[in-house]
Amino acid sequence: MAAWEFQSLQNIAKQNGWHQFISMQDYYSLLYRENEREMIPYCQSTGVGIIPFSPLARGLLTRPYGSQQTTRQKADIYSEFLLGETTSADIEIIGRVEELARQKGVSMATIAVAWCVAKGVIPILGLGSIDRVNQTVEGLARTKTGLLAEDDIKFLEQKYIAKPVTVVI
């Protein structure tokens, strides 16, 4: 959804005396950052909470590229629609997540979640096991103690190349 569309919905709600939206769910990860152009600044300026889904890019940011397909990738045809083709820039970013995770002694998922939190959003995570819950808690706790420095964030973001906007309904 474009920011102007979301604003239109807010206007309709206000004009009719309805409750306005207090949060926005949209796709956002190190591999898809198009919402940084309009939606995230709009939400931040109007006090709307941002709770993006798929911050681990359907599992791509949880393991070295090509090491194995996730269960979700094998069974979820929506995943292909959402992610599109994996680009060389995506592969480089995944490699950087892997490198930083190794340096800091944490999982790749922890790095990806910490990046989201550092960007001022609180992501929705699909946690299918106790290990995933523990990794997430660790990531959030370590984020508060400075897991990612500003240079780390720049390192993770540096290779990103803009993509066509994905419309999610």
PLM ranges: what are they?
Residues 14-20, 105, 145-148:
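Short helix-capping segments at alpha-helix termini
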Residues 1-34, 38:
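Glycine/proline-rich, positively charged
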Residues 2, 28-32, 54-61, 115, ...:
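Glycine-rich beta-alpha junction loops
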Residues 19-25, 49-51, 122-124:
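Structural preference for beta-strand elements that scaffold enzyme active sites
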Residues 35-73, 107:
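Aromatic-lined glycan-binding groove of carbohydrate-active enzymes
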Residues 6-9, 43, 133-136:
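Hydrophobic packing residues within well-ordered alpha-helices of enzyme cores
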Residues 24, 43, 50-53, 97, ...:
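Conserved, mostly hydrophobic/aromatic
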Residues 55, 83-143:
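Conserved short secondary-structure transition element at the edge of the structured enzyme core
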